[in-house]
Amino acid sequence: MLQTIFTYEWKQLLRSKGLIVALFIFTAIGFFCLKQGAIVYQYQRISVDSAMAKKIRSYDFVKNIFDTIKHSNIRSSIETPYILERRLQDVVAKNISPLSVLSIGQGDIYAPLISGHFNNEIFKNNFSEFKNPEQLLAGNLDASFFIVFLFPLLLLALTYNLQSADKELGIDSLLYTQAASVDVLFRQRLLFRWLIALLPMFFLTFLSFWLLYSLPGFSSLSFLQWWGVAFLYALFWLVVVALVHRLKFNSLVNAISLAGVWVLLLIAIPGLLNTWFNFQNPATNKTEIAEFRDYNAKIWDQSSENKRKHFFANYIQVLKGSANVDSNFIDIFSSALQILDKEKELHNVIANNANAQMKAEEKSFWINPVGGVVRSFAIIGNTGLEQQIQFEKAVMKYREEKLHYFFENILFQTNFTKKDFEKIPTYFEPNMELKFGKYLLPLSLLTLIAIFLSSIKIKNNNQ
């Protein structure tokens, strides 16, 4: 019976030239979205590779200097922290996952490169405050955008009149003469049209695998997880369509109802929630970042007495030998410490605000299940906000370690030797593999509830 229904629907599909054209158009749009993600990835990959190659060349150049340097009682310029850092041209790169091609997420908002110089504040690289993925609403033109926003429209266009059209054309009486019940026939026809709507997604799945599998860092498990989330989302919309059809509306009402559900789930609810969350957790004003830069200048202009007072509060062990320490180094170190502390304070305020908003959004996924899908895509693609926060915190920690290492060497040693150079702290990337299953729980539960409600309705009809 299923084969007969599929054959019938396939013949109907071939007769509908407009539907075939629509499938080709949606497939072309999907290809364009995938290409846009690939362009962003390629641009970032080239930027990172170029910057890291330059960093390696600079490191080798400075290393050669320390291989031949002759030390004396007076430090050479290369042995001073600022000159050494300027020569090293240190930069830290975030891991760019191949799956970011599918879900750009925060990838086009935040640069994947941050200066590793201990005195180059993070706000020089990124002026804007954090933004959450759900706040992007329509999002980026990538595969996740196509799946989240456009796939439902294609499915709704294929199925809105699936049941009502038979009655409107006067052929519904023929369906009652079939061996199978009308509900079974409806489910089989709906399944076929859902599979037709999935054709562009199948195309993107195979094409994306062909594009990504050879890229460095590609993970088959993560790839399957990403597309698993996509097909779970597609299943959710299948159940939504089935549930609306159980109400036995005519084609016009079905179209309006399904379009209303699309607007509600993808535009209205996320938009209202974001407005509320922004009110509850206002983003850090860019004026505060500008004021931090003014603070930077004020610290360098403060008196030497104030600088030394702050320094000795942190390094009391230096008091005994302070007469032997160059006061200029103390002033510079003190200023750098104060600026970094202020930068960490401001960055923590921004990060804590973002974390508070993300937790609030997580609770709202029960009424905004699409938000959970968007966040899952971003996490699997390593482009989520939480991963960006972890990256920037790791860079802050790295810069602080370097600051203390360079200046403590000046305080407690006569020279900065080759051995000291080889022990310069290195950056370690934090573990950014986050669990995303909890974000899909609302969508999964809502899908099961809709299936249950549809089953009850079908059972009552059969009775």
Where do the model's predicted regions map?
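Transmembrane alpha-helical segments and their membrane-interface loop/helix boundaries
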Residues: 1-134, 262-463
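Alpha-helical membrane-protein architecture signal
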Residues: 2-7, 183, 187, 220, ...
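Membrane-water interface at transmembrane helix exits
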Residues: 11, 160-164, 208, 212, ...
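Helix-loop-helix units of permease transmembrane domains in multi-pass membrane transporters
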Residues: 14, 157-199, 461-462
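A structural motif at transmembrane helix-loop-helix junctions in multipass membrane proteins
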Residues: 15-16, 231-269
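Membrane-helix interface segments
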Residues: 17-18, 181-182, 219, 251-254
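Secretory targeting signals
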Residues: 25, 29-38, 134-153, 192-249, ...
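Long, hydrophobic alpha-helical segments
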Residues: 139-169, 447-450
